[in-house]
């Protein structure tokens, strides 16, 4: 999971060396290009969690840790983190089942958690009110019956976009979502994939990496491309490639620059490189 507050990016939990699941947090200073040493958090170790910054605070939770058939492996805890004081506060638990691989975005007051997995692929969309600490479910009639997990999305100039993911096969759908929960179909992403990542600049959304599932655990393709989406023209273009193909990368935006990196290579080894993208 990753988010940005001020001039810093924060990377929380995930998978580390020797396939270990982590609960710590690293802080990246975008101005000095320096990573601070890891710090402890009150979070349970997890992968495929969800994080979203609203103003000077971040909201973090959900994810997975444990056995695929254990109820307690699907995490629904939800936390508020204040970087200025380095304090954590436990909030109302997430009431949905789509706790693994959900994507979050904000309108500045509310956080919307979209899709995910929890004993099945979900098409649910839940809204969290940061002022009242209350969760509500968005009416499903406002969006398509398009269920998925491990999708990607970002907000560009106040408009949110979401797509790709997995539901028994890799997906390349791409939608614009307004803050009433209405979905509008946009041009498909080149290359069906899941476990990609997005980060936005002032004009574009960049989508990087991911995997196309080929039908078996050993078949398929890892992506090294960086795709650029232009909301004004609803068009995709190839922006470049990273030196390595990867899944489960992280992404965040600081001062109009997109940062994308880390993740896992095809041999399931963790990667430590972070890339800066400017329009």
Protein language model regions, located:
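Kelch-like beta-propeller repeat domains
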Residues: 1-279
